[in-house]
Design a protein with these regions (language model features):
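Enzymes that bind and transform nitrogen-containing heteroaromatic metabolites
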Residues: 1-216
């Protein structure tokens, strides 16, 4: 049965997954990009963007598997953008250029209606204004039997967690204290009764945690 999954989602030691102050120069907020240094170091990331080099090993293996059996994605409007300092917000088509790295349908949660559009490489963006369950239903239909990836950001992951709709999370704990920002595990009382950590895999840079919905 297809699942809703979170994969390679970075979280700091004090629980933050995004920093305040998002802008064109700082998509993850001020100093938030430090959460992603482990990704930038992998061979998988460098190969994806046509660059040589990158390290192999545990982190690279997790990144290489992060798109396995994914047929569609869901993200929040803050992850899609635009940031507050974008000049032409109506023309905004995401952070990723003309050929985004998704290569499948992406459903963006939004409070404002916006026409769907297609990008190079098979990525399409559809904007959903009637809630998280509607987005999930549309994403599962588009995925055609494959899993749906919940890409982020933190507020969106938190909404789906509170609703108990996520089947599996792969969180990456980065040895970094941020002090402020946005957490996924905030105001999610009762989540401990729904989920459990079943796998802990440390690398030299980060720790990988697999959290699944408890069997009933």
């Amino acid at each position: 049965m297809p699942k809703l999954v979170v994969r390679s989602f970075a979280i700091s030691l004090d629980g933050f997954s995004a920093a305040p102050g998002q802008s064109l120069e700082a998509p993850f907020g001020k100093d938030g990009l430090k959460l992603m240094n482990w990704v930038f170091a992998t061979r998988f990331f460098n190969t994806m963007f046509g660059k040589p080099g990158g390290v192999e090993g545990i982190d690279n293996d997790f990144m290489a598997r992060s798109d396995d059996n994914i047929g569609a994605s869901i993200m929040g409007r803050h992850m899609f953008g635009p940031p507050p300092d974008a000049k032409d917000k109506e023309a905004w088509k995401g952070w990723w250029g003309e050929n985004p790295p998704y290569h499948h349908p992406v459903f963006v949660l939004s409070h404002q209606k916006k026409a769907s559009f297609d990008m190079e490489g098979g990525t399409s963006f559809t904007f959903v204004t009637d809630g998280i369950e509607s987005a999930l239903k549309q994403a599962f239909a588009a995925a055609k039997g494959k899993d749906v990836r919940l890409a982020g950001g933190p507020a969106t992951v938190r909404q789906y967690l509170k609703a108990g709709l996520i089947d599996e999370l792969h969180l990456v704990q980065v040895p970094l204290l941020m002090g402020q920002g946005e957490r996924i595990f905030e105001d999610v009382g009762g989540v401990e009764s729904l989920y459990e950590c079943v796998e802990f895999t440390p690398s030299k840079a980060v720790s990988h945690l697999r959290i699944v919905k408890k069997a009933r």
